[in-house]
Amino acid sequence: MKNLFLIIGAPGSGKTTDAGCIAQMNQSVAHYSTGDLLRAEVAKDSELGKKIDKIISGGNLVPLEIVINTITSAIHACEKDFIIIDGYPRSVEQMTELDKVLANEYDINLSAVIEVNVSEEVAKERVLGRARGADDNEEVFYNRMKVFVEPIEEIRKFYNEKGIFHSINGERTIEEIVTDINAIIVKKIVQG
């Protein structure tokens, strides 16, 4: 049985960095960033990669079927039983589709959804300060922030009703944030 942990948060919340730290701390945990999985496809310079690149460059969401197929392929190919995926879901449609897919995946259990919560001001400061790529400018930031904010209440409610939603303060030191996220994951590992 694979145990899946989703880490969500605004652009610049630190979710990818946090998840990477946890995977380094725990040998039994694998980490995939939705963005990295999609950027890897772009790097292949395939037709699909070119399509994804155009969408990402505008700060928009990649079509649902592409993201779901990318995620489920990564989970099935993973040799580890505890998997963190950050940056997913980003819309109600993505959440609903993942729920449908997981209902038919008897070897994958969604163990927790963890939101790294930061204010828009902190998110903007972090994103514009990191200059990771062409998608890190003010106009694209506001578009990405809008894409994040619009569905977040419904996403929180959905996973809260399932009893698997956790929100942590992402405006602290990375050590404090990682400790909190790791505690949630380790608890699930120990429970089996």
From Swiss-Prot:
Disulfide bond residue pairs: none
GO cellular component: cytoplasm
Record-listed E.C. numbers: 2.7.4.3
Catalytic activity: AMP + ATP = 2 ADP
Residues reported to bind AMP: T34, R39, N60, L61, V62, G87, Y88, P89, R90, Q94, R132, R144
Subcellular location: Cytoplasm
Region (LID): 129-135
Pathway as given in its UniProt record: Purine metabolism; AMP biosynthesis via salvage pathway; AMP from ADP: step 1/1
EC supergroup of this enzyme: transferase
Entry-linked PROSITE patterns: ADENYLATE_KINASE
Chain residue ranges for the region called NMP: 33-62
Binding site for ATP: G12, S13, G14, K15, T16, T17, R130, R172
Written domain comment of the UniProt record: Consists of three domains, a large central CORE domain and two small peripheral domains, NMPbind and LID, which undergo movements during catalysis. The LID domain closes over the site of phosphoryl transfer upon ATP binding. Assembling and dissambling the active center during each catalytic cycle provides an effective means to prevent ATP hydrolysis.
Function description: Catalyzes the reversible transfer of the terminal phosphate group between ATP and AMP. Plays an important role in cellular energy homeostasis and in adenine nucleotide metabolism.
Protein name: Adenylate kinase
Gene name of the encoded protein: adk
